[in-house]
Regions:
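A short hydrophobic beta-strand segment most commonly corresponding to one strand
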Residues: 60, 87, 101-121
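Conserved short histidine dyad/triad with adjacent acidic residue
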Residues: 24-27, 38-55, 90
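Short acidic-glycine-tyrosine-enriched beta hairpin
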Residues: 74-91
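A short, N-terminal "cap"/entry segment at the start of jelly-roll beta-barrel domains
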Residues: 1-37, 117-131
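Conserved strand-loop elements at the edges of beta-sheets that form or border functional pockets
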Residues: 30, 54, 62, 80-82, ...
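Short, conserved beta-strand element in jelly-roll/cupin
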Residues: 41-45, 54-70, 109-112
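Short beta-strand His + acidic residue motifs that chelate non-heme Fe in jelly-roll/DSBH
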Residues: 50-52, 70-71, 88, 93-100
Length: 131
C-alpha cells in the first residue's frame, strides 16, 4: 500500500511547448511497471489550453472546478463543468483548457504504452480555440 499525501509532490509549470497560457500541474500518482497508469491535477488560468495531442491508450478527464472547453479534431468546441467526465479514445487528436474568462481544474488520467502516455503536436490557434 502507498499513500501519497496531498501537497507532498511539487507543482510544475506547464511547459510552453505543450501549453498556451499559464498552467499548473500537480502530480497525483505515477505507478511503476508493470502498472502503467498516471494522473495529475491540472489547473488552467483563463484562456490557457493544451496543444493538440493524442494518447496511445486514451485519456480520462474529471472536471473538479471552473469552466473549460474541449475539442476533438473535426468536432465542435464543447463546454465542460465540475462533475463532467471526458473520455478521449486512444489516438484521438484533441485539446482541452479553460474558457476565456474562467479558471479550469481537472484530474487527468492516462496510461503509458511503451513508456509513452502522450504525443504532443502543434499549438491550438486562437481561431481554433474560439471555435
Amino acid at each position: 500500500m502507498q499513500i501519497t499525501r496531498v501537497g507532498s509532490q511539487p507543482s510544475a509549470k506547464g511547459p510552453s511547448d505543450w501549453f498556451t497560457g499559464t498552467v499548473r500541474i500537480d502530480p497525483l500518482f505515477d505507478r511503476p511497471e508493470p502498472s502503467r497508469v498516471g494522473g495529475a491535477t491540472v489547473t488552467f488560468e483563463p484562456g490557457a489550453r493544451t496543444a493538440w495531442h493524442t494518447h496511445p491508450l486514451g485519456q480520462t478527464l474529471i472536471v473538479t472546478a471552473g469552466c473549460g472547453w474541449v475539442q476533438r479534431q473535426g468536432g465542435p468546441v464543447e463546454e465542460i463543468r465540475p462533475g463532467d467526465v471526458v473520455w478521449f479514445a486512444p489516438g484521438e487528436k484533441h485539446w482541452h483548457g479553460a474558457s476565456p474568462a474562467t479558471v479550469l481544474t481537472h484530474i487527468a488520467i492516462q496510461e503509458r504504452l511503451d513508456g509513452q502516455a502522450v504525443d504532443w503536436m502543434e499549438h491550438v490557434t486562437d481561431e481554433e480555440y474560439q471555435g
